[in-house]
């Protein structure tokens, strides 16, 4: 019987952490009736012993057959915690009662825990013996130390003081070791491992930490990360709404929370690697993440994977409008594998338990447990459940955008998941063997890289992120909702002026997007068209949805030799919003780019539009018979208009008032033309 129950601790693949988390709930549930015959008892004796000894009845002992023990052991390896249905099925198979099955598994887990605790005690005893020997060596060394000047003992008299100090230090080390061992019971599958000591005994558990974060702080971060992971898993399993969209009474702080689930064209390992690599993460979510960096690696993943990895990160999160401040956050990111093809990545502010001083600063916010759960479903696809929950000062946001940020579309789960789906679809299309452009692979890659730089420059001019060193200008005759920025530029060389404003329009996002992308309607609002309609000379599709592409435009009906200018444009449209960004480029430069040349030397001054839902919860859109207008009671969309112009070719030149008035008039004129074309009253 004992031979069936012994665990070979000398095996190299023995993993005690597998059992530590599984055995927590069994600590007071059951005890073994006997070390030699725990699997031979039905469990009736435990109940009999707890009753008052008024009547003595002969206890029946039931010894399981070898076949029963073999089947129970086999099932235990697969599932140490069978549910009632599994116990009934197993009992029916082995002709045992469900209660007998239950007690057998309880006793089996209890004995496994006892064996594991015994080996933990061996580890601690070895560590204690090692510390004791080191202390003895230091004691002997100090006892024989002599002063260089006087030749006397360094510590006069008895060495009791030195012994006392060593005991204090030993106690501190022992306490720290106990804390790490306790943490190991929770940190299953992380970077804590059994390290083989120099004396050849069983290793002690250690924790690799960053160089800039102290050991105590790292343990605190790990505790916080694991609590956040538990909270994320609970939120993902809830079937009801997670949070109320309203602020607490009497508080200016807002607590938006959202959850969204969808399919993504990427496998779990690739997505986990993207999320845990700061540069890849910022590139994937470029319209949300302005800048990001990893401050410290708190814990590396185990076995060369990202499982158990904890990062201390900081990032700036943006909404495409000058009326919404950039949200700056410092947070922990923890990645954990919960099964084959099942991962979870959680973010949480590292100062979540502190006060709200950070919220008082402009753009300050706090991140509650947020992140995603990723599950492989085959064919290179994953099912992703995204959860977002944060806190910010509502008074810092313009009233026009407060409903949007309170919904899941502003910076909520819908925005993150839709962006992930769009980007993964784009990467999948670009990696496919089908050629829709007639360009070489190098040419396509070069033009897409140029379009990406154009987008990032446009985002920076709208949100004033730190990608470029923008300086804010306060000018007269400029509306309060219009932001004027300036910066020195190297390509093109000179002073660049950026102007952006946002407004609400009573048209649907789809209607406005189609109008702005229609080349035949371009002359109704774009001064670069010179009154002519525009046509595509090149189109690189980036998604299945119509309008998601990078294109080259030129005036229709004109010979290519008549004009040396083309317009590079990128557009996309999904449930989270839409984008139309463009920039004039010269033909020789684009010929070089389309041939696979370096696009970094092409000068760009992007302009364009960002379209966002207005965050209203009204019913379906209402169209009129002539052009897509909706009633004021129905939801419209939020339009952000942004222009960048070169006002002086000398980087050292001073900005004049006329330049500011020019770009301000350009924005006002463009908005007026769009309103007129869509028959929207001013």
Swiss-Prot record:
Phenotype on disruption: In plants missing HDG3, HDG7, HDG11, PDF2 and ATML1, increased cell division leading to cell overproliferation.
Subcellular location: Nucleus
Region described as Disordered: 33-65
CDD domains xref list: homeodomain, START_ArGLABRA2_like
Record flagged with keyword Nucleus: yes
Single Gene Ontology BP annotation: cell differentiation
Gene3D superfamilies for this protein: 3.30.530.20, Homeodomain-like
Pfam families listed in its UniProt record: Homeodomain, START
Superkingdom as given in the UniProt entry: Eukaryota
Keyword Transcription: yes
InterPro entries: GLABRA2/ANL2/PDF2/ATML1-like (IPR042160), HD (IPR001356), Homeodomain-like_sf (IPR009057), START-like_dom_sf (IPR023393), START_lipid-bd_dom (IPR002913)
Coiled-coil regions, chain positions: 105-186
GO cellular component: nucleus
Basic residues bias locations: 52-65
Residue ranges constituting the START domain according to the UniProt record: 214-429
Similarity-based family: Belongs to the HD-ZIP homeobox family. Class IV subfamily.
PANTHER family reported in the protein's UniProt record: HOMEOBOX-LEUCINE ZIPPER PROTEIN HDG7, HOMEOBOX-LEUCINE ZIPPER PROTEIN MERISTEM L1
Subunit structure, interactors included: Interacts with AIL7/PLT7.
Role, per record: Probable transcription factor that binds to the DNA sequence 5'-GCATTAAATGC-3'. Seems to promote cell differentiation.
UniProt protein name: Homeobox-leucine zipper protein HDG7
Organism listed in the record: Arabidopsis thaliana (Mouse-ear cress)
Taxonomic lineage from the root: Eukaryota, Viridiplantae, Streptophyta, Embryophyta, Tracheophyta
Gene: HDG7
């Amino acid at each position: 019987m004992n031979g069936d129950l012994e665990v070979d601790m000398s095996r190299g693949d023995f993993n005690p952490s597998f059992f530590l988390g599984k055995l927590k709930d069994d600590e007071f549930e059951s005890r073994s009736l006997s070390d030699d015959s725990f699997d031979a008892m039905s469990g009736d004796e435990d109940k009999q012993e707890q009753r008052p000894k008024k009547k003595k009845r002969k206890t029946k002992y039931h010894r399981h057959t070898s076949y029963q023990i073999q089947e129970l052991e086999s099932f235990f390896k697969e599932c140490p915690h069978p549910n009632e249905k599994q116990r009934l099925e197993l009992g029916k198979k082995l002709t045992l009662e469900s209660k007998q099955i239950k007690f057998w598994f309880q006793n089996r887990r209890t004995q496994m825990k006892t064996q594991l605790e015994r080996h933990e005690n061996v580890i601690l005893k070895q560590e204690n013996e090692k510390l004791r020997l080191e202390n003895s060596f230091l004691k002997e060394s100090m006892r024989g130390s002599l002063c260089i000047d006087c030749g006397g003992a360094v510590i006069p008299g008895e060495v009791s003081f030195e012994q006392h100090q060593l005991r204090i230090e030993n106690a501190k080390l022992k306490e720290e070791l106990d804390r790490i061992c306790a943490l190991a019971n929770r940190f299953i599958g992380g970077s804590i491992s059994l390290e083989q000591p120099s004396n050849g005994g069983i290793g002690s558990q250690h924790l690799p930490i960053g160089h800039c974060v102290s050991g105590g702080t790292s343990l605190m971060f790990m505790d916080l990360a694991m609590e956040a992971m538990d909270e994320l898993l609970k939120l993902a399993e809830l079937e009801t709404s997670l949070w109320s969209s309203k602020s607490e009474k009497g508080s200016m702080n807002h607590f938006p929370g959202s959850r969204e689930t969808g399919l993504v064209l990427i496998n779990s390992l690739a997505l986990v690697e993207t999320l845990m690599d700061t540069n890849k993460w910022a590139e994937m979510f470029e319209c949300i993440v302005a800048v990001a960096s990893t401050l410290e690696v708190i814990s590396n993943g185990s076995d060369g994977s990202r499982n158990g990895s904890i990062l201390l990160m900081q990032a700036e999160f943006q909404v495409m409008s000058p009326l919404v401040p950039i949200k700056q956050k410092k947070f922990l990111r923890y990645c954990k594998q919960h099964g084959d093809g099942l991962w979870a990545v959680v973010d949480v502010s590292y100062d979540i338990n502190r006060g709200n001083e950070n919220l008082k600063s402009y753009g300050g916010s706090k991140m509650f447990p947020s992140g995603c759960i990723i599950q492989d479903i085959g064919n290179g696809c994953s099912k992703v459940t995204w959860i977002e929950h944060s806190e910010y000062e509502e008074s810092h946001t313009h009233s026009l955008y407060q409903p949007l940020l309170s919904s899941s579309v502003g910076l909520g789960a819908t925005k993150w998941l839709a962006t992930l789906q769009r980007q993964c679809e784009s990467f999948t299309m670009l990696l496919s063997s089908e050629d829709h452009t007639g360009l070489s692979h190098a040419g396509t890659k070069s033009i897409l890289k140029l379009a990406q730089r154009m987008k990032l420059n446009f985002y920076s001019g709208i949100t004033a992120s730190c990608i470029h060193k923008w300086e804010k200008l306060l000018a007269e005759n400029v509306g309060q909702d219009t932001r004027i920025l300036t910066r020195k530029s190297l390509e093109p060389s000179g002073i660049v002026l950026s102007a952006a404003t946002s407004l609400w329009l009573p048209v649907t996002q789809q209607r406005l997007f189609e109008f702005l992308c229609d080349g035949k309607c371009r002359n109704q609002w774009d001064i670069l068209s010179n009154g002519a309609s525009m046509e595509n000379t090149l189109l690189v599709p980036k998604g299945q949805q119509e309008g998601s592409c990078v294109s080259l435009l030129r005036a229709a009906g004109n010979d290519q030799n008549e004009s040396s200018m083309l317009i590079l444009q990128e557009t996309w449209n999904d449930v989270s919003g839409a984008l139309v960004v463009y920039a004039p480029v010269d033909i020789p430069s684009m010929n070089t780019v389309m041939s696979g040349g370096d696009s970094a030397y092409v000068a760009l001054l992007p302009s364009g539009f960002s379209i966002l839902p207005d965050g209203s919860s009204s019913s379906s859109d209402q169209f009129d018979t002539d052009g897509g207008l909706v009633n004021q009671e129905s939801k419209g969309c939020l339009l952000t208009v942004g222009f960048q112009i070169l006002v002086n070719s000398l980087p050292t030149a001073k900005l004049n008032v006329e330049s500011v008035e020019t770009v301000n008039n350009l924005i006002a004129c463009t908005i007026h033309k769009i309103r007129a074309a869509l028959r929207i009253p001013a």
